Swiss-Prot record:
Catalytic activity field: L-seryl-[protein] + ATP = O-phospho-L-seryl-[protein] + ADP + H(+); L-threonyl-[protein] + ATP = O-phospho-L-threonyl-[protein] + ADP + H(+); ATP + H2O = ADP + phosphate + H(+)
Subunit structure: Homohexamer; hexamerization is dependent on ATP-binding. The KaiABC complex composition changes during the circadian cycle to control KaiC phosphorylation. Complexes KaiC(6), KaiA(2-4):KaiC(6), KaiB(6):KaiC(6) and KaiC(6):KaiB(6):KaiA(12) are among the most important forms, many form cooperatively. KaiC interacts with SasA, activating its autokinase function and leading to RpaA activation.
UniProt lineage: Bacteria, Bacillati, Cyanobacteriota, Cyanophyceae, Acaryochloridales
Cofactor info, note text: Binds 2 Mg(2+) ions per subunit, one in each domain. Mg(2+) is required for hexamerization and phosphatase activity.
Domain of life of the native organism: Bacteria
Domain-level remarks: In the homohexamer the 2 domains (called CI and CII) self-associate to each form a 'donut' layer; the compactness and local conformation of the domains varies over the cell cycle and impacts function. CII has the autokinase and autophosphatase activities, both CI and CII have (weak) ATPase activity; CI has the clock pacemaker role.
Protein name: Circadian clock oscillator protein KaiC
Organism: Acaryochloris marina (strain MBIC 11017)
Protein family per UniProt: Belongs to the KaiC family.
A GO BP annotation: circadian rhythm
Length: 522
């Protein structure tokens, strides 16, 4: 039975006339567009070279045929049909089979390599008739046109070309097909399109970008307008995977995940006690501190505890190799290789610079969907933050934490700070508000010797120890000791010894402020 390709997105206001939308089945796009693109209208997809415009159009047609049995016509003004078919195969889209089945027709309007002379006034009448004939013959519901910029480049009379393309879009709208038309733009944040195409194809405009941010390129998609209907505003990151375009609709995420009162162990008994019995099952934990403070050790204990209980776990490592991680863990009595052999642990080591943040996010989501772990660890977030903007990094963290919570997974992430001693920002990009629990590790100098300190800086929904405790690292792992009772100013990096007499004096001052006498306290 044929599936409905119409959007199920509805508005609550009964007085408004709703614009019917058609689903694209492009991952994430139907979320940010509130149900797809308007039925029977033309949508302009604009972007610089290499941003994914042609792929968007082909993916729209392919999914329409495969999922909804909507025949389609694709008009190409640039690439040859042979190249289009071959390129689509790399994504598993067998366009030739669809053509053989009579579901797809590719109309070749690409320029003649030998060139051509125009006698008389230029018009697209013959092409418009060919397109209309193909639509009628194949009973097409969807049309893709790639790209109208090529027409302007072939002919000098831009005003005449604009007029003819307006005729084409008007005819397509009259026929009632839903069209995706691509065009090029000069700059990522300049005019919407070259030659003023958006002036006559103005019902719907989508902009795709491939911007160099810092040291890496970042792909984003923005719906500039969908006339007569709602959509989400702003740019949304996307990547191109083996399955095509994959948009991450971070703004479409809803805080509707369930919250569990169940607890999971950190793998360190004293730390569990400091956290009121362990971490909440579906919480996100961030451990932050300078290099060498023991962050990866806590990650190892966290993963070991999961595997001891027969649960699966994934470690996404961006700073150390698998061999180095396994060696270090083994020195603390943790056998990562044995856990992997049992199928309980999966370690993925990647250089942060090997891909963009969107690609890393897609890999994390894919691995979670395939392996189905109950716990994940990322070591470290700060490595992924190198060379990218704060906004891009924050969106990445939101994507990871949102997906982990959706899947009810406990996440344990590390962050390396630049300061060895003293107070510091937990994270420069302010991601601390996204996490549920924050563990702060730091170095402290006490009586001329270097020590380590740990404290539970924050824990949502639970009592936790407020003390700053000393801890050391032995061959058995972390050993958390008592709090630094006789010192103050540890977090600021200037610990000062407080004598018992001074502590009594401070206590009396507090009592006087509260209006209490010694007799009242007895």
């Amino acid at each position: 039975m044929k599936k409905s390709n119409l959007s199920q997105y509805k508005k609550n206001d009964k007085n408004k006339v709703e614009v019917t939308k058609i689903l694209t089945r492009i991952e994430g796009f139907d979320d940010i567009s509130h149900g797809g693109i308007p039925l029977g209208r033309t949508t302009l997809v604009s972007g610089t070279s290499g941003t994914g415009k042609t792929m968007f159009a082909i993916q729209f047609l392919y999914h329409g045929i495969v999922h909804f049995d909507d025949p389609a016509v694709f008009v190409t003004f640039e690439e040859s049909p042979k190249d289009i078919i071959q390129n689509a195969l790399s994504f598993g889209w067998d366009l030739q089979q669809l053509m053989d089945d009579g579901k797809l027709f590719i109309l070749d309007a690409s320029p003649d390599p030998e060139g051509q002379d125009i006698a008389g006034e230029f018009d697209l009448s013959a092409l418009i008739e060919r397109i209309q004939y193909a639509i009628s013959k194949y009973q097409a519901k969807r049309v893709g046109i790639d790209s109208v910029t090529a027409i302007f480049q072939q002919y000098d009379a831009a005003t005449v070309v604009r007029r003819e393309i307006f005729r084409l879009t008007a005819r397509l709208k009259q026929i009632g097909v839903t069209t995706v038309m691509t065009t090029e733009r000069v700059d990522e944040y300049g005019p919407v399109a070259r030659y003023g195409v958006e002036e006559f194809v103005s019902d719907n405009v989508v902009i795709v970008r491939n911007v160099l941010e810092g040291e890496r390129r970042r792909r984003t998609l923005e719906i500039l307008k969908l006339r007569g209907t709602s959509h989400m505003k702003g740019e949304y990151p996307f990547t191109i995977t083996d399955d095509g375009i994959n948009i991450f609709p971070l703004g479409a995420m809803r805080l509707t995940q369930r919250s569990s009162n169940a607890r999971v162990s950190s793998g360190v008994q004293t730390l569990d006690e400091m956290c009121g019995g362990g971490f909440f099952k579906d919480s996100i934990i961030l451990v932050t501190g300078a290099t060498g403070t023991g962050k990866t050790l806590l990650v190892s204990k966290f993963l070991e505890d999961a595997c001891k209980n027969g649960d699966r776990a994934i470690l996404f490592a961006y700073e150390e190799s698998r061999a180095q991680l396994s060696r270090n863990a083994y020195s603390w009595g943790i056998d990562f290789e044995e856990m992997e052999q049992k199928g309980l642990l999966k370690i993925l080591c990647t250089y942060p610079e090997s891909a963009g943040l969107e690609d890393h996010l897609q890999q994390i989501k894919s691995e979670i969907a395939e392996f189905k772990p109950s716990r994940i660890s990322i070591d470290s977030l700060s490595a992924l933050a190198r060379g990218v903007s704060n906004n891009a990094f924050r969106q990445f963290v939101i994507g990871v934490t949102g997906f982990a919570k959706q899947e009810e997974i406990t996440g344990f992430f590390t962050n390396t700070t630049d300061h060895f001693l003293g107070s510091h920002s937990i994270t420069e990009s302010h991601i601390s508000t996204i996490t549920d629990t924050i563990l702060m590790l730091q170095y402290v100098e006490i009586l001329g010797e270097m020590s380590r300190a740990i404290n539970v800086f924050k824990m949502r929904g639970s009592w936790h120890d407020k003390g700053i405790r000393e801890y050391s690292i032995s061959q058995h792992g972390p050993e958390i000791k008592n709090a630094f009772h006789n010192f103050e100013g540890i977090i600021s990096g200037t610990p000062t010894r407080v004598s018992l007499d001074e502590k009594r004096d401070l206590s009396r001052i507090v009592q006087d402020v509260k209006g209490l006498s010694d007799d009242d306290l007895l």
